[in-house]
């Protein structure tokens, strides 16, 4: 696939590139209630996540999530709605200025994965990631995010991701990427380019002082219907 360019935002850091964390990414289960273009003023703290007007709405389309002004209180679709069996198997972030890889996550091959007792499996396992970066991460200008994913035996038309980033429930930036068409039973690789506008010193200071209050929702659509929803939160303090 071609490299796709995003619409700006706050985000990913490394001589190592300033901002790269020595732990980089820590996959976890989602905390119960933890509570990118940049804002030029310090946001007012908002209330914690809560159920919104989209909860229970079906189907959910791109215009629905583009209207959201806070992090969602829960996932807007179930794992079972991923009928296309889209599976992200590798994720890499690099600083576009230096080319340095900041971190990389890769799923082991199916043959090497441990057997799972499905009765004990968290249905939302794998849908939440916690990121840990150093303060310099907030000053990067451009980052490339490479994703590698497989699809099942159905063709995937008009595959699209909308990713919305918030600090204390104030929208910082919305990214909109189009993957296009994916043939059945294929493995696909695509790099999205995130352009990050400058953040005010006041906002950077607040985001560093309040780890994990920067959060994001990633919505994935096929033919304008929501089929996957992932969440993440972020620390820029450089410590777990």
UniProtKB/Swiss-Prot annotation:
Q: How is it modified after translation?
A: Phosphorylation suppresses its interaction with KLHL18 and down-regulates its KLHL18-mediated degradation. Phosphorylated more under light conditions than dark conditions. Dephosphorylated by calcineurin.
The domain of life for this entry's organism is Eukaryota
State the Gene3D superfamilies in the record: GMP phosphodiesterase, delta subunit (2.70.50.40)
InterPro entries the UniProt entry points to: Ig_E-set, PDE6D_unc-119_myristoyl-bd, PDED_dom, PDED_dom_sf
Q: Compositional bias (Gly residues) at which positions? A: 1-12
Q: Where does this polypeptide localize?
A: Cytoplasm, Cytoskeleton, Microtubule organizing center, Centrosome; Cytoplasm, Cytoskeleton, Spindle; Cytoplasm, Cytoskeleton, Spindle pole
Region Disordered, as annotated, extends over 1-62
One GO BP on record is: lipoprotein transport
Gene Ontology MF annotations: lipid binding
> What is this protein for, i.e. what is its function?
Involved in synaptic functions in photoreceptor cells, the signal transduction in immune cells as a Src family kinase activator, endosome recycling, the uptake of bacteria and endocytosis, protein trafficking in sensory neurons and as lipid-binding chaperone with specificity for a diverse subset of myristoylated proteins. Specifically binds the myristoyl moiety of a subset of N-terminally myristoylated proteins and is required for their localization. Binds myristoylated GNAT1 and is required for G-protein localization and trafficking in sensory neurons.
What does the sequence similarity comment in the record state about its family?
Belongs to the PDE6D/unc-119 family.
Subunit architecture: Interacts with CABP4; in the absence of calcium. May interact with GTP-bound ARL1. Interacts with ARL2 and ARL3 (GTP-bound forms); this promotes the release of myristoylated cargo proteins. Found in a complex with ARL3, RP2 and UNC119; RP2 induces hydrolysis of GTP ARL3 in the complex, leading to the release of UNC119. Interacts with NPHP3 (when myristoylated). Interacts with CYS1 (when myristoylated). Interacts with MACIR; interaction only takes place when UNC119 is not liganded with myristoylated proteins. Interacts with ARL1 and ARL3 GTP-bound forms. Interacts with ARL2.
What UniProt notes about the protein's domains is: Adopts an immunoglobulin-like beta-sandwich fold forming a hydrophobic cavity that captures N-terminally myristoylated target peptides. Phe residues within the hydrophobic beta sandwich are required for myristate binding.
Protein name stated in the entry? Protein unc-119 homolog A
Tell me what organism the protein belongs to. Answer: Rattus norvegicus
The root-end lineage is: Eukaryota, Metazoa, Chordata, Craniata, Vertebrata
Q: Tell me the name of the encoding gene.
A: Unc119
């Amino acid at each position: 696939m071609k490299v796709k360019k995003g619409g700006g935002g706050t985000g990913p850091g490394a001589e190592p590139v300033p901002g790269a964390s020595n732990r980089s990414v820590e996959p976890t289960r989602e905390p119960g209630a933890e509570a990118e273009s940049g804002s030029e003023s310090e946001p007012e703290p908002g209330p914690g996540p809560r159920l919104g007007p989209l909860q229970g709405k079906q189907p959910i389309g791109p215009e629905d999530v583009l209207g959201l002004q806070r992090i969602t209180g829960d996932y807007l679709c179930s794992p079972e709605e991923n009928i296309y069996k889209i599976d992200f198997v590798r994720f890499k972030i690099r600083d576009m200025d230096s080319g340095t890889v900041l971190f990389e996550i890769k799923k082991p091959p199916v043959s090497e994965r441990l057997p799972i007792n499905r009765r004990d499996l968290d249905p939302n396992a794998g849908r939440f990631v916690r990121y840990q970066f150093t303060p310099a991460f907030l000053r990067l200008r451009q980052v490339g995010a490479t994703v590698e994913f497989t699809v099942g035996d159905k063709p995937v038309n008009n595959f699209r991701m909308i990713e919305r980033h918030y600090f204390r429930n104030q929208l910082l930036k919305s990214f909109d990427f189009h993957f296009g068409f994916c043939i059945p039973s294929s493995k696909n690789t695509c790099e999205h380019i995130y352009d990050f506008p400058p953040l005010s010193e006041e906002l950077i200071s607040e985001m560093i002082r309040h780890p994990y209050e920067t959060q994001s929702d990633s919505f994935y659509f096929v033919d304008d219907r929501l089929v996957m929803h992932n969440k993440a939160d972020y620390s820029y303090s450089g410590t777990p």
